[in-house]
Design a protein with these regions (language model features):
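Alpha-helical structural signal with a strong bias for long, charge-/Ser/Thr/Gly-rich
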Residues: 80, 85-111, 115, 302-333
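Seven-transmembrane-like multi-pass membrane architecture, highlighting hydrophobic TM helices
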Residues: 20, 25-31, 101, 133, ...
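Universal eukaryotic N-terminal targeting presequences
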Residues: 1-2, 343
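Short non-domain terminal segments
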Residues: 46, 60, 73, 83, ...
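Skp1-binding F-box subdomain of Cullin-RING ligase substrate receptors
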Residues: 3-91, 95-96, 150-153, 172-183, ...
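Conserved phosphate-interacting/catalytic interface
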Residues: 200-343
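Residue-level detector of alpha-helical recognition elements and their boundaries
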Residues: 28-29, 47, 167, 236, ...
Length: 343
């Protein structure tokens, strides 16, 4: 009966199946296998607990090694890719970005079965040169794009957005619910990865950069904060405590205030934004702050206030500035979230 149904009806039905059900259906016959493969980006995804990239072979104990070879990858390149990369890349290109370990990295995946963690180590070519390398990387990256991950942790490595662009264009994205990214180099490429190839619920970015570098990419960072359709919450951690970095933090704060108060459309802004600064200079409250309330609790100063939009006064954002001091210096955390109009 399913065979004769229109494609859109079959797709609607298959969307009710979980990943295990889809795997079972694929094994019944070639028709269902090809149909599910064709629409796998719209159907249930294989779920993993975590993904990260590391050089530590013993990470997670003794993970199961997955080291594919091109002869075992039953996946022909499309005619377009076959023609484009028949002789491999003109210049070798790394799978991941890393200042120190670009030639040596492993993808670690964690999956939970019956409340027990299982670890996998996916060893792909670190430097892609040949057509066979391209075939392996294309196949497995495409599989990862069609999975979902609860956590992602990218400290020393990140997938190379230039490689993704060459193989897939900008259409492919990793689905990671809670993702943490550290930035101490290649900021432009990492921002490109976040904008084009990452989607999830929460994103945390730890910056270990000087102010002069951050300023160059301030507009790109602000564009990330306007991706409310991709992220529900973004936390920016500024670990550099130099005077120059403090100046940039003030500029970013003022840029957010200006957008909230004057933009004709605030709907695209990420609903919750957290800025955390270490050892900042004395924080200056915006003159546009309304309904200011200040209180101290256990040595921590809390300043709550609102910023209204002049184009539409019903659009309001609430702020909470949390200022504290300790043995390791002072810190300021600013939480910004959109107030939704009560019906």
């Amino acid at each position: 009966m399913l065979y004769s149904l229109p494609t859109e009806i079959k797709l609607y039905i298959f969307k009710f199946l979980n990943y295990e059900d889809l795997c079972s259906m694929k094994q019944t016959n070639l028709h269902f296998r090809d149909f599910i493969n064709n629409f796998e980006g719209e159907l249930a995804r294989e779920e993993f607990y975590e993904i990260d990239i590391d050089v530590d072979l013993m990470r997670g104990g003794f993970p199961k090694l997955i080291k594919p070879e091109s002869k075992n990858v039953d996946f022909p390149l499309s005619e377009e890719l076959e023609k484009k990369f028949k002789n491999g890349f003109t210049q070798p290109i790394p799978l991941c970005l890393s200042e120190q370990f670009a030639h040596f990295s492993y993808i670690f995946l964690t999956k939970v079965y019956n409340d027990e963690a299982c670890y996998f180590q996916l060893q792909l070519p670190s430097i892609i040169k040949s057509k066979n390398d391209i075939k392996i990387v294309y196949f497995y990256l495409n599989k990862l794009f069609n999975c979902s991950f609860e956590y992602g942790n990218f400290k020393d490595f990140i997938f190379n957005p230039e490689l993704i662009q060459l193989l897939f264009g900008n259409a492919k994205q990793f689905y990671i619910q809670k993702c943490k990214i550290y930035i101490d180099n290649d900021i432009g490429k990492i921002f490109g990865f976040i904008l084009n190839n990452l989607v999830g619920e929460k994103l945390r970015i730890d910056f270990l950069l000087e102010d002069d570098i951050l300023k160059i990419y301030k507009n790109t960072l602000f564009t990330i904060l306007l991706n409310g359709d991709k992220f529900q919450k973004i936390k920016l951690m500024f670990d550099n405590d130099t005077k120059k970095s403090n100046n940039y933090k003030s500029v970013l704060y003022e840029q957010i205030i200006e957008h909230i108060s004057t933009s004709k459309d605030c709907s695209k802004m990420v609903p919750v934004i957290i800025l955390k600064f270490f050892n900042p200079k004395k924080f200056k409250l915006s003159k546009k702050a309304e309904k200011v309330e200040i209180k101290k609790l256990n040595g921590v100063k809390y300043t709550n206030y609102q910023i209204s939009n002049i184009q539409n006064p019903k659009v309001k954002f609430s702020f909470c500035n949390k200022e504290s001091s300790g043995d390791y210096g002072s810190e300021v955390e600013i939480k910004i979230f959109k107030e939704f109009e009560k019906i």
